[in-house]
Amino acid sequence: MESTSQDRRATHVITIKPNETVLTAFPYRPHSSLLDFLKGEPRVLGATQILLALIIVGFGTIFALNYIGFSQRLPLVVLTGYPFWGALIFILTGYLTVTDKKSKLLGQGVTGMNVISSLVAITGITFTILSYRHQDKYCQMPSFEEICVFSRTLFIVLFFLPSDVTQNSEQPAPEENDQLQFVLQEEFSSDDSTTNAQSVIFGGYAFFKLTLSRSPLVSQPGNKGREFVPDEQKQSILPSPKFSEEEIEPLPPTLEKKPSENMSIQLDSTFKQMKDEDLQSAIVQPSQMQTKLLQDQAASLQVFPSHSALKLEDISPEDLPSQALPVEGLSEQTMPSKSTSSHVKQSSNLTANDLPPQGILSQDTSSQDMLFHDMTSQDMQSLDMLSQDTPSHAMPPQDIPSQDMLSQALSAHAILPEASTSHIVQFPEIQHLLQQPPDLQPENTEPQNQQILQMSYQDIRSEVMEETKEWKSEEELHRRKSSRRHSLNQQTKALQYLRRHSLDVQAKGQKSSKRHSLDQQSKGWQSPKQKSLDQQIKDWLSPKRHSVDKQAQLNQTKEQLPDQQAEDQQAKGEQYPEGQSKDGQVKDQQTDKEQNSKKQTQDQQTEDQPAQEKKSPKGQFQNVQAEGQQAQVEKVPKLLCQDSESQIQQYQFWQFHKGNLQAGQPRTVNLLAKNPLTG
């Protein structure tokens, strides 16, 4: 597709025979308006809201300064503070509308703010209307001291200016008014019968979208009925509401008499290339041109199925030789008669005069392009397009930028984008048959009709193949995208799994190492403390046991002498008082031992507490150690008491059997051997 900025003029040359009716349609470009521009443009809406907020703030400041400078009464709008808080709401709404990012929450917020801003605007209008009630009689007259001038100007700007802008924008530019020019060249028979041509054109607006479908040029006369046009060649026409209509005044056709030549209708129009995205529905209102020729013969029906327009590149006249003008066309059969077959062509910036059709040789090419060679041009002159009234035997020159017609003219041609290869198909056989007199028509019409059907079938098949190729390419792209997305999802899942696994391993290693270190630390702290406590207890008990043993031995040695003397003197009846005295001594010794053990346990507790506070580095093991120490401290006096009690019992047993020692010495020796004094 070409760029739309270039304006070109193009011409269709349609060669037909007399007694024919040509039905053609002419499209128009849709007119842009302010509403279409603002539709779907949130940035423009936000910018207008911000500008209106600034205007309202400006008016509010003017009224406030007027009150300060001239001490006049403020209107109700300014007293309510609408110029300030209303402007703030408008600015916030405009900012959010401009910075609207495609998210659901933000879209809902922008919609809510727009609703709030509309309500604020309605309140501002009501305040402005109510403020007129509190003004004096000068409010009805133009006064620079009151609010009337400012409010009126504001209403004028807000209500009248946008309507003027829309009206001006909806008026089409003069360049958009397409012009139709017809040049009728009549082919006269040998009788030189007079003919008259009359054209009627109905203009209108057409809104359409360019598609791959191809529309034929249909010519309908009146008597032989109507031939069937294939559905593939018809363009689907959808109705849409008209915005406006224009009637184009037809130019008076010029009749140029050329013996042994065809009657050509040249359609000269100026087009602007239109994009596929801007056009959505198609309405083609065909402009009818009826040529009523006064002849006795009945009109014959002719159908010219032209599947696509011819496309030529811009060729300057300097590059073209005078006797070899390349023109893109179709393969055409040479007939014995002087009249050439009907053809539809699109020329490109060619200026040629006096082009007789006798010296034209046609060549059939595989690319469906035909180059007409050896066209002898005599007396080549540069004539203007406006000089159509002067009859001459030469074709008028034409300033034709031809590349625009592929994208704009739907009158008798279909439009294809550059992505699809355009096939140029014509049926010269039908044209020759219809242009020849009845006597010269060949008999082999059936094979020619079969060839025509085959060509149309091949053309339709090529179109279907092109569309299927496009669909296949789209499917392949979709598959590639889906495979890429699947691979990316798998990669992301694998990375996430590896990361989670590594994090789990690290966490487990850290936990296990921490637990192991804590266990080792607790064991390391507990083991030396337990050993130290055991050693302290043993060290504390061992001297006590030695002291108790020594005291017991001393008591025994001391008591043996008086006991022996007493036993000798009082052998018979003095054992009981001696037992009482001995029991008193034993009780005294027990009390002394208990006091000493209590003092020692208290000293040990006072010494163990600071030592344990110094040795415990962590607060986690302090409670455990304190409990162990308390249990051990509680066990120490119990052990001491048990040892002392055992020693007392042994001592009592020894004293009890002392009397027996004197009576039977061998028996006491055996008892002493069995029960020795051990701490």
Swiss-Prot record:
InterPro entries: CD20-like, MS4A
Ranges of compositional bias, category Low complexity: 337-348
Annotated TM spans: 50-70, 76-96, 110-130, 141-161
Polar residues composition bias: residue spans: 519-535, 550-563, 619-632
Mode of membrane association: Multi-pass membrane protein
GO CC terms: plasma membrane
Region (Disordered): 218-259, 331-363, 469-491, 505-633
Biological process (GO), any one: cell surface receptor signaling pathway
Compartments it resides in: Membrane
Transmembrane as UniProt keyword: yes
Compositionally biased tracts (Basic and acidic residues): 224-234, 469-478, 580-601
UniProt KW keywords: Membrane, Receptor, Transmembrane, Transmembrane helix
The keyword Nucleus belongs to this UniProt entry's keyword annotation: no
Its job: May be involved in signal transduction as a component of a multimeric receptor complex.
PANTHER family: MEMBRANE-SPANNING 4-DOMAINS SUBFAMILY A MEMBER 14, MEMBRANE-SPANNING 4-DOMAINS SUBFAMILY A MS4A -RELATED
Family in the record: Belongs to the MS4A family.
Name this polypeptide is given: Membrane-spanning 4-domains subfamily A member 14
